């Protein structure tokens, strides 16, 4: 999976490559067979509304790698993830930052957060803060964040997110993925 992602130009950072190789993705998508779990181009839907529309998924591995490359997580960074999904991305973030307790992930659906909490604990990342709440409001209790990643489909960057990013020369870096298709990076005015 990782070699195919790298051939496509993602997982450029050695730390991103390492965590993708070291993390058993299939444990976060237990209902998917191994071929689907490790297909670099396929998202795995893990939760649906009653009418069949998808509510939550594990993003395609190529997209996960692209987001993490762009997020450029450094050891010790405090991170907010909007959109818990399966907990897979939070486990990667915990490894990149070096401490699971520096990662906060938030989702509005209690079933999604409960399953992600279980998967994270089983994988050894029970110290990740999994919050049930409105991700559009961010999570000020653990702010300021050095990095913020939205794995949901935001129409815009809410003012609350900007307020929760670390200020100054090392200002926080947000990455958002509209519609889980294209990757956009936003920077605050004055941030390089």
Over which residues does each language-model region extend?
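Class I SAM-dependent transferase core
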Residues: 1-80, 84-85, 89, 112, ...
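Residues in well-ordered beta-strands of folded domains
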Residues: 39, 172, 187
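A residue-identity detector for tryptophan
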Residues: 41, 62, 155, 161-162, ...
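Short C-terminal domain-edge/linker segments immediately following a structured domain
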Residues: 50-52, 162, 179-181
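Conserved nucleotide-cofactor-binding alpha/beta core module
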Residues: 69-172, 176-178
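Class I S-adenosyl-L-methionine
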Residues: 183-192
